[in-house]
Amino acid sequence: MHDYVYGAGLALAEIAGHFTGAAEKTGRCSEAPTGSAERSTEKRSRKLNLLGATPLDLGPQSAVDAIKKRLKNYGWEILSTWAMGDTLEALSRAGEAAVNLVVSSVGIPAANVLKEKFGTPFLVGTPVEGYEGQISDALERIADRSCGEWVNKKDDSAEESGGQILGKQEELWKVTPEQVIYFQGRNSLSAVSDPSGESREMPDKDEVFFSVPDITIIGEPVTMGSLAAVIEQKYGKKVQLLCPLEITEGLLRKGDETICGEEAMEEKLKTARIIVADPLYRPICPKTAIFYEMPHIAFSGRIYLRKYFPE
């Protein structure tokens, strides 16, 4: 049996494969008429799709609107949001974007289909509060870099290849480290806290290892991985993500783990000092740990919806 990520991901991939129209590259820098290349490039390079926006991971529409606002404040035009708050007509324009941003693991298959179909590059990361600047910078770099690589193509071959990838599970879920924004700068801390609370210098920034993390968070790899990155950068604390979901390959940072089953999770949490997780995890957490509630609708449903997402 698969979890929700698998089913929702395949559903969005099917939409990307069949409802985004024929593959037609337009507005390319290399094809623009003389004098209009810069205008065409600038206009296209700021267009973006958000992939994997579902209430199961992000919560109500207001949470998605907040994410979109953060990106718009950095000058991005959100063409479509897959799939909260937008129509099928809006999703059908996805091929016009310069870059796609996967905001949860659900969006990875659609991102790969759109890449195969239109050549659109994608990055993985959630613009949680305090992280939107880094997200925008990463998007800017890849949008600028890919602009000159696009070539006009007005036949059906790209559309067909988009359909072909739908039948290849490994290709649908493929993610490379370079595409994951919250991997970047992970080892940038020059000093960390040891269990005594004192700061110590690390001998090699590429060998950051913590036997006991300062903070343990539980949840979906992209949203919580992005949150972990913000906490580490802002507070200099080591954060470990424990993910109870099925699809994590290529999405977990060094030191993060996939945990299957309640017993395994309870065992892993025995040494946790600060825990951020859905409230339903509290009964299996040690009483000595500080527990911060962060509801995950895919786990606890609507039990805490009104308490934490009043609208």
Task: Go through the PLM ranges and name each one.
Residues 1-311:
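An N-terminal assembly and electron-transfer interface module characteristic of large anaerobic redox
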